[in-house]
Amino acid sequence: RGEAVLAWKLVVFSAAPLGDFLTLVGATSGKLLLQENRIAFDTGSALVYAPNPIQESGNLGLSDAGDAASNALDNARLAVTLLGLDPGIGTLKGEYVDLVGLAGGLAVPDADEVSRVYNYDRADDRFEQATIYHSIDSIQRYFHSLGFDDDTGAVNGIRDFPTLAHAHWNTADQSFYSTG
């Protein structure tokens, strides 16, 4: 609004959620004026389905074939930038998604690339991890860009902390979300 306001400045360094948070609170109103995470996160790149190979290719005849790689399915992958990755590690853990912190599930190798390039074909178990990271992170960033956040008080799925995810929890259909 262009007017000077007396404010309290709070700086919080946090491990969970990871961040260097700057918060400005109006000294007389007590209203939140600004809150932002000023930590520097890393970026990476990956080949993912966004949103899925049938929609991307228009080919209704595509089938899973037990996660086998094929030219048609590999050609449906898109090159994307992975945002918000935690610095100093190669796994898919970041500002809005954590694919390594959830114990349990099937024993598959983590996508762990010091280069931050996660280009796998779909026969590689790590391909699903890159796709899930990109999908959840993109959705959370989109919601935040609309002005939604986790500060509304109501449980709304908009998170200011990482969503724990596991790409290979079991061998059944995993197209579900659980808040528990």
Annotate the PLM regions:
Residues 1-180:
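Zymogen propeptides/activation segments of proteases
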